[in-house]
């Protein structure tokens, strides 16, 4: 498996993040989602890395060029990211603010925030190598958030209702497999390392459950071998998807889905939905014109093949070498949102 160059290319701009919740609003006419909380990596990060001493940040042009006002907010894309779309789809809010944004309004606290940190992962080595917020440290931020929420709401029962009726959105594992695992292949087999990632996910979910969380939407990894960063590794003539890397991602996703099915029987009152990111994105890659895409192998921006950003990011499945474009998220989000509504009702 040729992970090494992919690992290098993802170092500055990779991703992971957890979940969400809605405040006294109805979705599908049956369930009140109080808030959305997101944890994990750059698929969900809305700006938590901006003030960190890390290269894994994107609060600069051309990032955000299609965002409201053309502003680079620290989101890893050309516009809104996946957590924003889930928040809007669940009728919570249009944009999910970053918890570590110094300008965060206390009025945003009751309807949820994002704790995710681009470049992070379940493995502590992933986060430390990137200089970003490790997922368990994001949970510490959530604990601090609850204290602040108590100060804003000033009603313990209402706070408990917000926490228990929220959706927790989690995206973790992408960077562990793409960045960290290539450095550990002599120490771990694919089977043992993916088992570790699932165990760490299990610990994460149980930690949040102990703090009152009950509704979990957990994302699988992307088809990592089809990221532009993987396609453009040295010697990959034809820029095809790297099947061995996709196979590793698929192994983790299968184990993660099975674990979530098992947790239903272990944690009373909790609900879990596995969010398949792998196959919907792979479908866009394999059938691009059906959704109006032209380029599936390159990023619109920020690659050796595109030193000048493309004029129209909506024609690209990927914005840069590791992150889907806003249009890709918009294309796959509706079915995922319906699945979350159905399974977390």
UniProtKB/Swiss-Prot annotation:
Glycans are attached at residue 103. It comes from Arabidopsis thaliana. Belongs to the 'GDSL' lipolytic enzyme family. GO terms for biological process: lipid catabolic process. Keywords: Glycoprotein, Hydrolase, Lipid degradation, Lipid metabolism, Secreted, Signal. It is found in: Secreted. CDD domains: SGNH_plant_lipase_like. InterPro entries: GDSL, GDSL_lipolytic_enzyme, Lipase_GDSL_AS, SGNH_hydro_sf, SGNH_plant_lipase-like. The active site is at residues 42, 320, 323. This is GDSL esterase/lipase At1g23500. It holds the Pfam family Lipase_GDSL. Residues 1-24 form the signal peptide. It is an enzyme of class 3 (hydrolase). Coiled coil: none annotated. GO terms for molecular function: lipase activity. Its EC number is 3.1.1.-. GO terms for cellular component: extracellular region.
């Amino acid at each position: 498996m040729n992970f090494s160059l992919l690992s290098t290319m993802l170092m500055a701009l990779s991703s992971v993040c957890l979940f969400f919740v809605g405040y006294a609003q109805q979705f599908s006419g049956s369930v009140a989602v109080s808030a959305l909380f997101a944890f994990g990596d750059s698929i969900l990060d809305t700006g938590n890395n901006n003030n960190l001493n890390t290269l894994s940040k994107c609060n600069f042009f051309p990032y955000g060029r299609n965002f409201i006002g053309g502003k680079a907010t620290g989101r890893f894309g050309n516009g809104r990211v996946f957590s924003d779309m889930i928040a809007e789809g669940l009728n919570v809010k249009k944009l999910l603010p970053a918890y570590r944004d110094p300008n965060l309004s206390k009025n945003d606290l009751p309807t949820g925030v994002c704790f995710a940190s681009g470049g992070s992962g379940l493995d502590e080595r992933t986060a430390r190598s990137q200089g970003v917020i490790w997922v368990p440290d994001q949970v510490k931020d959530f604990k601090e958030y609850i204290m602040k929420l108590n100060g804003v709401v000033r009603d313990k029962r209402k706070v408990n209702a917000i926490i228990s009726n929220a959706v927790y959105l989690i995206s973790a594992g992408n960077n562990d497999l793409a960045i960290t695992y290539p450095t550990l292949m002599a120490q771990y087999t694919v089977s043992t390392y993916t088992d570790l990632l699932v165990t760490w996910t299990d610990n994460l979910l149980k930690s949040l459950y102990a703090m009152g969380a009950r509704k979990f939407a957990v994302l699988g990894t992307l088809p990592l071998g089809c990221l532009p960063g993987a396609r453009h590794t040295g010697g990959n003539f034809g820029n095809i998807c790297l099947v061995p890397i996709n196979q590793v991602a698929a192994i983790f996703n299968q184990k993660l889905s099975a674990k979530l099915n098992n947790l239903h029987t272990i944690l009373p009152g909790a609900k879990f939905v596995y969010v398949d990111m792998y196959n919907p994105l792979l479908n866009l890659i394999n059938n691009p014109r059906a959704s109006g895409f032209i380029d599936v192998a390159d990023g619109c921006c920020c690659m050796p093949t595109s030193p000048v950003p493309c004029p129209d990011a909506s024609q690209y499945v990927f914005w840069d070498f590791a992150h889907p474009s806003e249009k890709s998220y918009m294309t796959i989000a509706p079915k995922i949102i319906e699945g979350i509504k159905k399974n977390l009702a």
